[in-house]
């Protein structure tokens, strides 16, 4: 078991040494972190258009997650204060109750060929269904390398929606996210589908609603870890369950509820070089599958067992290969810190982080209030914006916390007073 005692109170250099002592990174990985070695400008210029430079974000670590019995140190990239601290807090508390359990329901991507001007949709649908095996073979022939790796096209079906006959294709992309793979296969099917349907192909494109790549994370938290006061612990558990119910019935709350989940998910997706926009799009669409936006997680209080049960399910078509994953040295460090998991394991970890983030947010909301934990972080941000040096931040923060409410103007005044007194 890796112990990173005092990690949150250490300096960045001390944290890196703790990683070295724990054997979590190779010497090359340690050097990458020490040198703050990120994406070279020359490489960035080859990745996107009209490059001017690169934009850095804080790269942190949430230690002590236990997922399916394995201890995981989770890299997170985010500019938002409190996200990493909240994830770490929740991970530690949930680990004491047995950690997170996860389930990968399936891992396949879905794409579609939309057909229009189909005069006889039922007849066309039947013709496509009868040609299913031949169409799957054509799809695999369009991308033979994935078949060699054990993946490839798995299923094909049609649905009539409005004026469209839509042909869906599901593909096992193995360790890749599979966008290019799927699009190549789909485009290879357009001509034969037009012939079979006697219609026109409108578009062939993957879908970011990856309902064939659902992952569930769950946890059970003993009431005694919610508060030392048994009555207060039971009240917190009940309020967290009520907060979950609120997100299920009110889309205004659901949007913020789910945004909090993605505070954690996006941070890990970004750290591991994955497409956070695709994950967000799929997650938020999945949350609205009933016709109304709802919370992605659910929490149930069990007073008889003195246990709070949490669960989160969402599409997680994450990758460990392909795209820009191998280009950024910091991304490789993130994968190393995680133990270089395969795509399914990485998906399990990410959904567990989302559930941890959700628990931390809900517990704060129904007990101390969200601003209580944010005050010190807000004061620190104001101190930095006011121009405080690293040695000046702590006294400015202390002065602001002792004189609420505070703002940037007050932070500047406090900083000026500190400098004059020195």
Q: How should each PLM-predicted stretch be described?
A:
Residues 97-129, 287-351, 357:
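A structural-propensity feature for long, helix-poor, extended segments
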Residues 58-83, 174-182, 248-273, 354-363, ...:
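Conserved phosphate/anionic-ligand binding catalytic regions in large, soluble enzymes, centered on
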Residues 175-177, 182-330:
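Glycine-rich anion/phosphate-binding loop at the beta-strand->alpha-helix junction
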Residues 308, 315-422:
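Catalytic-core signal marking the mid-to-C-terminal active-site face
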Residues 1-45, 50-51, 88, 92, ...:
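Alpha/propeptide regions of enzymes that mature by internal proteolysis
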Residues 1-72, 76, 80, 100, ...:
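Acidic/polar, glycine-rich intrinsically disordered N-terminal extensions of enzymes
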Residues 33, 99-105, 142-155, 196-208, ...:
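Flexible, glycine/charged-enriched surface loops at secondary-structure junctions
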Residues 44-49, 53-162, 166-170:
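Small-residue-rich
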